[in-house]
């Protein structure tokens, strides 16, 4: 996959109110985004898998399942993409629940256009960072991926030696290769990159 850019990101919009959906879609298309819109979560879920890079903008209150349930369904399908929730009738608890699930932003209608664009920009940045990291990880050998995953879990050299049945020089070599291929200079930068 070539390096994706901001304008190649598909925005999936799930909004049951037709006038709201059309208004948001028109605005985003005018701004140059690729938008695919749906009136219900299940209609959207039927189209999985979909193109990446992508982000989702979803109303919390949908006719079939809630926006949070939609996001949980995506996670269950191993589709972890940034989501922005919108709602005209949001409670504080809904907002908290959405953010705990991993929402990038929770906007209450009516929201300012700048609020939406800022949330989209943030979500796209997160999505592109994730895709670029995945491209780098694809360049790791299977053993380097094992080392990478263990490093992210906080394992030290001795634990890597024990778990992977390798010598200290070999562990150090794998760590060095992982950091070189992921273009980081320190373990803390490796962990930061993967957040």
Where are these regions (language model features)?
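C-terminal output helix
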Residues: 91, 111-120, 159, 163
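Basic, Lys/Arg-enriched C-terminal extension of HTH/homeodomain DNA-binding domains
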Residues: 179-195
């Amino acid at each position: 996959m070539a390096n994706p850019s901001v304008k190649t990101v598909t925005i999936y919009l799930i909004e049951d109110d037709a006038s709201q959906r059309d208004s948001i879609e028109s605005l985003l298309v005018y701004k140059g985004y690729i938008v695919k819109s749906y009136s219900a979560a299940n209609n959207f879920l039927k189209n999985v898998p979909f193109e990446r890079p992508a982000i989702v903008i979803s109303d919390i209150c949908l006719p079939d399942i809630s926006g949070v349930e939609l996001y949980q369904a995506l996670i269950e399908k191993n589709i972890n993409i940034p989501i922005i929730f919108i709602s005209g009738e949001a409670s504080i608890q809904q907002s908290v629940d959405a953010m705990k699930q991993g929402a990038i932003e929770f906007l209450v209608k009516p929201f300012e256009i700048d609020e939406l664009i800022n949330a989209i920009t943030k979500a796209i940045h997160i999505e592109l960072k994730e895709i670029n990291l995945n491209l780098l990880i694809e360049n790791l050998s299977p053993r380097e991926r094992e080392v990478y995953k263990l490093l992210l879990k906080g394992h030290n050299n001795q634990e890597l030696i024990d778990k992977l049945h390798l010598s200290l020089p070999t562990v150090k070599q794998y760590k060095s290769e992982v950091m070189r291929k992921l273009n980081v200079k320190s373990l803390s930068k490796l962990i930061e990159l993967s957040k």
